[in-house]
């Protein structure tokens, strides 16, 4: 399973949840086109109805095991901010969301207002953490859910995330199977032909984990929900 373009139909919320909710294209312009206001509204509607997806719940469970009470959380590509909302409800002191697409902002603001939590969240738009990590303050826990499969240089991205993490990093990725790699190539070829900048990547899981290990974060948590593998690493 690899990242593909979002579709209008409602995404299943069981462990068979699709991978199409994860990925960003290479440039912000394409990102806004692919992940538009309609897509953001759908995610917000699903969250209001069903809560976190199973894979997002695993991400939050790991963060909880590290310790959310009084903690700061930084999420890269957090979209509507559903994981952050739940982290705040579990005792996190403050969260920061770094996002490339402006389409999520209206829905994120509405969700924050509904929860009465706007004053505990910072949302940064147009910041590429891998390129400008110094633009983002460090946090106790750094989250990258359904993000690394979209970024061409996972080493820079995860390295930057590790550099911002005081205590832990948790990320999710699709499996690197033969089918996943073939599908990624097929999807990317289609988008190239249609002039769409969206790209999907099936990075090697062990190589991604090694990036974090090389920066002092050792894997302590591995769980699977449908196509999503969740890895949590803590500061040694």
Segments from the language model and where they lie:
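Conserved beta-strand signature within the Rossmann-like core of class I S-adenosyl-L-methionine
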Residues: 166-175
């Amino acid at each position: 399973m690899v990242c593909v373009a979002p579709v209008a139909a409602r995404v299943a919320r069981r462990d068979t949840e699709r991978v199409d909710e994860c990925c960003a294209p290479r440039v912000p312009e394409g990102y806004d086109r692919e992940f538009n206001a309609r897509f953001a509204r759908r995610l917000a509607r699903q969250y209001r109805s069903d809560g976190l997806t199973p894979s997002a719940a695993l991400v939050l469970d790991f963060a909880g095991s590290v310790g959310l009470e009084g903690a700061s959380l930084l999420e890269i590509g957090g979209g509507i901010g559903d994981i952050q909302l739940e982290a705040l409800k579990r005792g996190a002191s403050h969260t920061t969301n770094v996002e490339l697409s402006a389409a999520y902002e209206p829905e994120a603001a509405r969700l924050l207002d509904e929860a009465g939590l706007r004053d505990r969240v910072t949302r940064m738009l147009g910041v590429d953490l891998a390129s400008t990590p110094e633009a983002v303050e460090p946090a106790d826990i750094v989250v990258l859910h359904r993000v690394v499969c979209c970024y061409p240089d996972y080493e820079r991205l995860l390295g930057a995330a590790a550099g911002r993490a005081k205590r832990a990093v948790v990320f999710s990725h699709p499996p690197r199977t033969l089918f996943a790699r073939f599908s990624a190539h097929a999807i990317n070829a289609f988008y190239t032909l249609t002039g769409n900048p969206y790209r999907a990547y099936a990075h090697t899981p062990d190589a991604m984990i090694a990036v974090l290990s090389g920066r002092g974060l050792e894997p302590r948590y591995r769980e699977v929900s449908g196509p999503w593998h969740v890895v949590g690493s803590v500061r040694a």
